[in-house]
Amino acid sequence: WSSDVCSSDLAVIRFFRAFDYFDKIKTFGDVPWYEKDLTTADIDELYKARDDRDFVLGKIIEDLEFAIEWLPEKSAAEVGALHKDAARTFLARVCLHYGTYKKYHNVSTSPTSQELLQKAATLAKEVMDSGLYDIVQGSDAGANQSAFADYPLYYANQFTQEDLTTNKECILARVFEADVLTHNLARGGGVGLSKDFAESFLCKDGLPIANSSEYKGDETLDDEMANRDPRMYQIIDSKYRPYTVKSNGMRVVNSGIDDKKEFSPSEEPGTNIHSAPGLTGTATGYSPIKLVSASQSQQDAVKTSSYDWFVFRYAEILLIYAEAKCELGECTQAVLDETINKLRDRVEMKHLTVSPVADLNPVDYGYSITPLLYEIRRERRVELMAEGSRYHDLMRWACGIRLNQPKLGIIPDKATSENDLNGYNTKDYESIKSGLGFVDGAIDVYTKRMTNPVPNFIDPKNYLFSIPTNQIGLNPNLKQNPGWD
C-alpha cells in the first residue's frame, strides 16, 4: 500500500476515535486518553487517573484535523464513506459545543471560547464556500407522499427520502438497504413532544406567539397550529399531514378529516393507514412525525425500514455558522441571509433580521441574551428537532435548569370534539383522565406516573454524569465527579 492509502485509513480510525472521545468528555468531563493498544502489562496506563478535558479536547481536534487532511474529497469517496467535509462538519460541531460551553460555564482555559468559536465559524464557512451543498425542498416522490396544495412538505420530505446519497443537503448519509442494513423509524415510537416545544414555533408573520395577532390560542389543535411556521405541521402530527398509502395504488389522507376528503381519489381507505393523533398514541398529544415514513412498504416493514438517514446535514453547518458569528459579535444581515434565512426560505417563512422583536414570553435560560441570539437558538431547536442536539445544547448553554420544567401536553378537556381528528380523542380522554394529572388544563405527563414527577437537575452536578462505581472499584485513581460522591 502507498503511504497515502495508509494515511487515509488512519484518518478514518482517528475520526472515529475523536467521535467516541467527544461523547465521553461531554458525558464525564475528564477521561483517560489512550492512543495505543494496551496489554495487561501496561499497568501504569491501565490504572492511571483521568486526563484533563482540555487535553483530550486538544487530541480530538488533532484527530479531526488529520482526518480533514487525509480523507478523500466527497467526490472521490465511496457512497456513505467518510470524506473531508464530514470531518470539517464534525470538528465545527465540536468547536461550537466547547466554545459556547466555556463561555457560559465561565471556563477560561486554553483553547479559549473565542478561539473555538472562531474555528467553528471558519470550518463552517469552508463547507459553505465549497458550493457542493444547498438547502433542498424535499421531493414528494422520493418520500412516497403528496401534500395538500396549501400545506407543502418541503421540510418533512427530506427525512424520509429513500436515497440521500445524491441529495445536496446531505453531507454524509447513513445508507440503508433492505436485507442488508435496516432500521425501525417508519412508524415512530409513540413518544410525545412537549407543549414548551409546540410554543416555540413562530407565527407566519415571523413573530413569537406572545407577540403575534395571528396566534389563535390552544383550545384546539387546529387553532394552535393555524398561522404557524410550516415546520410545525411537518413535525407534529395533525390533519395537515397527508400520507401516501400504497395499497391498491391509492393516496389516502388521515382518516376522519372531512374537509380534506378531496385529496383522496377514493372514499375507501387503504390498509395500515396512518391516523391523526389520538391521546393513547402519544404521551402528550403532540405526536412527532418528522422521521415517520408515508410509504406503505416502509410502514409494513416495521423494524426493517430502509430509507436513508442524515449523519451530517448542511442545515447544521448553517446553524453553526450563524450561532458562532453571533457569539463572536459578527452576525450581520448578510450572515443571516446565507444561513437562517435559507432555512426559512425552504418553508416560506418571513426572514430573520439583525434586530428582531424580543419575545414577550421568553424561555428562561437563567441569564439574559440578545433577541438575535435568542432567535438563532429558537431556529436551531426547530430545525434540528429529533436529530440529537437539544440535550447537548442545553448543557453547553449552561441552562440545564430547563429540564426541571413540567412536561406538559395538549389541553384535551378543551378539545375533545374540535380536536377529535380520528374519532378517538373523546373516548381516549375519558379512559386516561384518571391516570393523568393536569396543569392549567394541559396534560402533565409525569404527575401520576412517577414517584418523583419533576426532574431534579442540580447545577453544577448534573452537567456531568457520575463515573460508574464499578469502574472506580477497578481503578481507584478514577475520582468521582463533583456532587456524585
Predicted regions: what they are:
Residues S2-G189, L207-D485:
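Acidic/polar-rich alpha-helix caps and helix-coil junctions
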Residues A186-K204:
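C-terminal/domain-terminus segments
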